[in-house]
Amino acid sequence: ENSMLKSVMADAKKGDSFMRQNRIKKFLTAGLSGLLILSLTGCGQAAKLPETVENTSLVVEKDGKVTSYLVNTFDKDFYNLDGLTQMVEEEAEEFNATHTEATENPMNVKTVQVLGDGAMVQVVQEFADTDSYAEYNEQDLFYGTRVEALAQGLTVNREFVNAADGTPADSEKLDKALEKNHLIITNASAYIYCPYPVLYISEGVVMGEDGYVDASQSDGVVT
């Protein structure tokens, strides 16, 4: 009788954790905008991350590693910090377990913490590369050259504006930039911190004052 009760409780717990996991997925997803493309220069100062990240942000490193900062309202009716941390870590373990061929974990949880007065929570995850980020979050994120983008079947449209002032890009200069520099292509709604200064951006995207790209409201450009 006791073992029967145990298994019923275990099932109830499973159902509960499944529901909670669905909630956590919703909570953790950065959200989708249209596909946006950023063309980067090959040198210069990259955007500087603030000391406390209070907006959902993606940081792409020169070697393609990605740090994801997810910031959301902390609903104490649904989560407590320990439970949230446990769920985030379990999801990471499950994701990494499906990638046993990888030499390093595709994803690691860095921190789960409440910000400031406790109204917001921030989850920081590190991804080995843009593909791992894209797969885990079911979003698009590409960092590489135009040739690599085309090889992956991504179309690079040419509806760019100058990052500096929002004026339409000069097509000759744009071609040169696209030939030799890196691109970031994504549909994540987030502040995007690029490894190099941004030269050209899709229409509908805003440059932040510290050099980041504000794609949090954007419909981007669907390519």
Regions found by a protein language model. Give the residues of each.
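Bacterial signal peptide processing site
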Residues: 44-46
